[in-house]
Structure formats: structure tokens, C-alpha cells
Amino acid sequence: MAIQVLPPQLANQIAAGEVVERPASVIKELVENSLDAGATRVDIDIDKGGSKLIRIRDNGGGIPKAELALALARHATSKVQTLEDLEAILSFGFRGEALASISSVSRLTLTSRTTEQAEAWQAYAEGSEVAIRVMPAAHPVGTTIEVADLFFNTPARRRFLKSDKTEFTHIDEWLKRIALIRSDVHFSLSHNGKPVRQYRCAATDTQYLQRLAQVAGRAFADSAIKVDCQHDGMGLSGYLQSPALSDMVDCHYFYVNGRLIRDRLVNHAVRQAFGELGTFEQPAFVLSLTLDPHQVDVNVHPAKHEVRFHQARYVHDFILQVLQSALSQMQDLPLAEELPRAQESPASVREHTAGYAPYTFNRDAATEAAGVLSSLPDTQRSQRQPEKAASGQRSSVDAGLSQGSSAHRASQTGLGQSGNAATFETSERHGSGYSGAGQGQRYVRDQLSGQQRQAAQYYAELLHTPEVVSTSGSLQAGLPMPPLLAGRYWVLAQDEHLRLLSISDAAKALVVQEILSKLPTGLVGQPLLMPVAVAADADWTMILAERESLLRRLGLELTIRYQQLIIKKVPPYLRDSQLAKLIPEFLEWIKLEVPADEALCHWLAQYVTGFDAAPKVWQRIQSLEATERNKILESARDLPWQTWLDEYKH
């Protein structure tokens, strides 16, 4: 078959296969055109799920008479004129394909009037190559487009349409998405002549929350965390599901420069931010990212659902840091930047691994306390249970005990679900905080200060639990995994003492040993999806030259080009870190000295996130040599039982 140019009608119908999937995609294209025209009100009327009729009316700028017919031609647009315009797109449309594609598979009527015209004009096209007819019409300033009998000339595609109800659901869902980002526009939707949706303009935060409640539900709107941050030419604003809201909300909307997108990078950043709290596999969010249009390519998907960031890693880290900050402030947690950093010197790394002062445990006193508690009336005991505060946040912490992964029968809520516990987890992840005996023990005591009766009962019960692992001075191989406290600590019995072994500390110690074993031969650097660029200091070139062998052993590939430090490869332990801040700090450290291997290992380990589950960590500990196992045991903390019981008695 000879090569030939396709007829315009066939070319338009092929293009319609990408642009016009169903009635919802028609409405998407037409409403976006209305918004590009500056409309502040858009009315949508549909019949039979949009397959019979779609009518879009707006009060935008309108289309001049001379351009009506041209508007229905393929690749005709007013939104881009040059290649430079294509590289900095802020409008929804830019390809000039929508109207031509829609008119090729429907009976389309376009009526419009500009402020300069005394009367309106109407263009009509019926899915054929017949010349477009233009005639006078009555119409206010703005545009109305009617799309009748969608796919009337392509029966095969019409048969693939679902029921009217299903098609309407797709339309309704899309309208929700656009209504959340364009709060300055009044939207209305009618189906078969009956009003269904009406989103009024939202000029204030209160009005926007009303619109948010219409879309995502009242529970989400009332408890949502507001996000608003501007930094270095980028801005992130919107609302985030509160950890206090346990219900799953089907609301996952992310916008880039006003355009709704689906992006795995964004979803990963949101999940990672909530992962620090140990909650939500898929939290709800409505977030809008604004950045220089030159830094994002929107011309990568036929339906414009995806974008490509020129600095993907930087965008990811910006989103992650803003969300972590919002969650921390909401729960009154210390931010990562406020915590002491262990990489400042090898001494601080050693300080972080220091042990804790021992305490004695009075078995008789604990048993006596348990007896006193058991004699309390049920009503008094029930009043000790944690309650939810009116704000939706947890007002107390319930120290739950579990064997393996099963929750202790006396507790339903562990420390991992409370705001203060998240503080502890965040501190540990950044290798800081609670690094001394007084701080670590004071943290546990403060969490239980309001529930000492219940805590004493829990621990007294532990004394009669045969499954508590007895270490007898050393951690033997082959022992079963000990009980869990609040999902974060193992409870060990040593002589007459009960000790808490932090699972995250143990996991971090395993990471340190893993890195220490690999460091002599060198770590394997992983290339970044997008290299990170940082403004370089004058002496960094000298540092890279003098410490070249050290950087190679760590798997770091750094170059300086045009007065910028380009980060190309990093060891896997740093992949989830803020490299633009971390690497410059590291260069300042190694400029002064060549750190010891152990200090380097602790520095890398503190940035590892997503540790293994407790059973796997315990299994790895059991596989170690006795000396290494005992090192981990030494990091366990004695419980100050005598102090707590004395406070209880008084």
C-alpha cells in the first residue's frame, strides 16, 4: 500500500481517539477552554450521561466572528505561538486539537460573542468535511458549545460507552477535581434537566472549606491540616488529612500550576511524610504546587494527565519537607532541622550511642501495686482509659503490650498512634534527641505520668508472663522474639530488672554493622533519577580532589560544573534524604578531618528510613555473633520502677 497523507476527517477521528474517550473527556476539554478564556461562571447541562447532549455555557471573553470557523480547525489555537511559549505553558489547552476532534465525532454548535461585537455568531459542524456554516445568533458575552449525539458516526465507539449513570459519575468526579482548584469560578451541573451540583465562588477560607466539604466530606474538611509554604520559586498549598481522622477518604488530588495530574513521585512523597507517623497507606490530600513553568513539561501525555519535572528529586524533597513540617506543627512535634545533628562530629555520633544509667526494680512493690489496682471499682479503672480530645487529636497515650504482632488485651491504642510517640520516632530517625539517660527515661515517664495506675498494672502482669525473654547477662541465640511494648520496644528480663530495647535502635545498629562490613571494599552508589544541583562554595573543588578516595568508598559521585555542585550518585542509605542540604554539610565535615569508618557508618545509618518489621529485626540479631548481640543488648534501658511506684503510692 502506497504512503499517502490521511484525509482531514480521518486524521481528526484518529486524534479524537486520544482526546475524546467518553463524555467526561469532552466536558474536560470544553470547560478548560472556558477557564482559559477567563470565565468566572461555567454552567454544564447534560442529557443521558452526556451521550445525547452536552451543553457548556460560560461568561468568558468569547471568540470573534472571524475566528469561529478557524476555532474548529485542527492545530488552531491562540494559546501558543512559538517554541518558547510551549516550554512555559500556563494554560490548560495548547495543542488546538480538542474542538476539531470533538466536532469530528458529534454534531457541534459553537455560539459566541465578544465585548467588541454587537451581536453573537454561531458555527455548526456535523462530523464531516462539509464547510462550517456561520450565522448570526442571540447570545450574551461569552461562549456556549453544544455537543449532540456523541459518536453518532462511529458506532463501534458508541457501543463502548457505559450506562448513563456510570458516564455521569465520571463527569461528576471530574467536576469535583476542577472545582477544588478553581475556587474563583462558579460551577453548576444539571442532568436530564435537574440541577445536581452547584459550587459557588469561594473567596475566603471559610467558603473554600464549604466547597471542600461538598467534595471530600465534612469530616475531612473539619479536621484537615492546611498547608501553605513558599520557598525558592516554588509553593505548595492545600489541605492534608489529619492523622486524627481514622476514616479513609477517597480524595487524592494534586495540581501543578492549576493542572490536575497523576504522578508517582508526588504519591511517594505524601506516603513517606505520613509514614513517619506509622499511619495511613494512602492519606487524603488536596494539594497545589506552583513553580516556574519552565521547570515542568506538561506536553508528555495525550490527555495531559502526567507531567515531567526537570528537577524531580528537588520537587519530591520540597513536597516531603513541607508535609512533614505541617504534620509536625499540627502535633506539636520538633522539626528535623531543630534537632541536633549527629554528623557534626564523630564525638556526637559516639554520644548518640551512649548507654543509660541502671535502675533497680522492686518485684514485691510491683506485685503489690497490681493488687491495689485490681481492687479498684470497674468504673474507676474505665476512667483511666485514653479518650479523644474535642479537637480530634489524642489527648493521652496508652502503653500497649503485645506478644509478637498481637495487641495486649488491656490496650487498643499504642504509642505508635500518638503525636508524642511520633516525636520520638522522628528524633530517632534523624539520629538525635533523647540521647542521654535523663532524656530517654523522662520521655517514657512523661508519657505514662497520667496513667501510672494502668502502667503499673501492665508491668506487674509482665512479671507473671513466662514469654518475657530472660537474657541472664547475655543475649543467647535461638531465643523467641520477646513481647512488644507499644510496637516500638522489646521487653527483656535481666536478673531482677525489666529492660526496654528500642526496635529502631536495634535496626539502626544492624544497619551500622552492615555498612561497616561493606565499607572496606566500597559502597555501590545509585544514580539519581534527576541529578541534584547546589550552589558550590569556592573550596569545594579542593575538597573533592583531596577526599576523592573517601567519596568513592561511600558511593558518592559529585562534580562541580558552572559553579554548581552536581550530585549524581549516592549510597542507597541516603536516597530518601534531603541531598541538597545533607551533602554540603558532609563536605564541610570532611574538610576538617577524615572521619573514622565507625563514625561514617553511624552518619549514614541515621538517614535510613523504613526499617524492617520487628520479627525480621529480631531474626537478624539472632544471626549475629555473641559479641555483636551483646552490644545491642547493652543499649537496652532499665525501667525506673521504684520511682514510678513511689509516685503511685503518694
UniProtKB/Swiss-Prot annotation:
Superkingdom: Bacteria
InterPro entries, A to Z: DNA_mismatch_repair_CS, DNA_mismatch_repair_MutL, DNA_mismatch_S5_2-like, HATPase_C_sf, MutL/Mlh/PMS, MutL/Mlh/Pms-like, MutL_C, MutL_C_dimsub
Keywords linked to the UniProt accession: DNA damage, DNA repair
Pfam families on file: DNA_mis_repair, HATPase_c_3, MutL_C
Assigned protein family: Belongs to the DNA mismatch repair MutL/HexB family.
Entry function: This protein is involved in the repair of mismatches in DNA. It is required for dam-dependent methyl-directed DNA mismatch repair. May act as a 'molecular matchmaker', a protein that promotes the formation of a stable complex between two or more DNA-binding proteins in an ATP-dependent manner without itself being part of a final effector complex.
NCBIfam families named among the record's database cross-references: mutl, PRK00095.1-1
Protein name, UniProt field: DNA mismatch repair protein MutL
Natural source organism: Shewanella amazonensis (strain ATCC BAA-1098 / SB2B)
Top-level taxonomy: Bacteria, Pseudomonadati, Pseudomonadota, Gammaproteobacteria, Alteromonadales
Gene label: mutL
